[in-house]
């Protein structure tokens, strides 16, 4: 079975929840619960309230997401999935 296409959205972390989860508000106003991707945990990338993040959402469940990138002030934003390696 092929991997389904994921939706990429950007948002802002509202609060840090227990068990390495985060409450995130998307740019369109929708709120959801997200967790950090495995590589973010592996490289100890910390996410705090107020951070701008890039998320992947499944088209089947829009209430949960995976944080794949944390934007850093002063760095140009990533716009495409093809720029990551």
Swiss-Prot record:
GO function terms (MF aspect): ribosome binding; rRNA binding; translation initiation factor activity
Cell membrane in keyword set: no
SUPFAM superfamilies in the cross-refs: Nucleic acid-binding proteins
One Pfam family cited in the UniProt record for this chain: eIF-1a
InterPro entries: NA-bd_OB-fold, RNA-binding_domain_S1_IF1, TIF_IF1
GO CC, any one term: cytosol
Record's keyword terms, sorted: Cytoplasm, Initiation factor, Protein biosynthesis, RNA-binding, rRNA-binding
Superkingdom classification of source: Bacteria
Positions of the S1-like domain: 1-72
UniProt key word Phosphoprotein: no
Localization terms from the record: Cytoplasm
Subunit structure: Component of the 30S ribosomal translation pre-initiation complex which assembles on the 30S ribosome in the order IF-2 and IF-3, IF-1 and N-formylmethionyl-tRNA(fMet); mRNA recruitment can occur at any time during PIC assembly.
Function: One of the essential components for the initiation of protein synthesis. Stabilizes the binding of IF-2 and IF-3 on the 30S subunit to which N-formylmethionyl-tRNA(fMet) subsequently binds. Helps modulate mRNA selection, yielding the 30S pre-initiation complex (PIC). Upon addition of the 50S ribosomal subunit IF-1, IF-2 and IF-3 are released leaving the mature 70S translation initiation complex.
Family recorded in the similarity comment: Belongs to the IF-1 family.
Name of the protein in its database record: Translation initiation factor IF-1 1
Source species taxonomy: Bacteria, Pseudomonadati, Pseudomonadota, Betaproteobacteria, Rhodocyclales
């Amino acid at each position: 079975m092929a991997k389904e296409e994921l939706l990429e959205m950007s948002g802002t972390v509202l609060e840090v929840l227990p068990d390495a989860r985060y409450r995130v508000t998307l740019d369109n106003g929708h709120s959801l619960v997200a967790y950090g991707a495995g590589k973010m945990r592996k490289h100890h990338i910390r996410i705090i309230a107020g951070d701008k993040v890039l998320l992947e959402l499944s088209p089947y469940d829009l209430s949960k997401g995976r944080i794949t990138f944390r934007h850093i002030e002063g760095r140009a934003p990533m716009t495409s999935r093809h720029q990551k390696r």
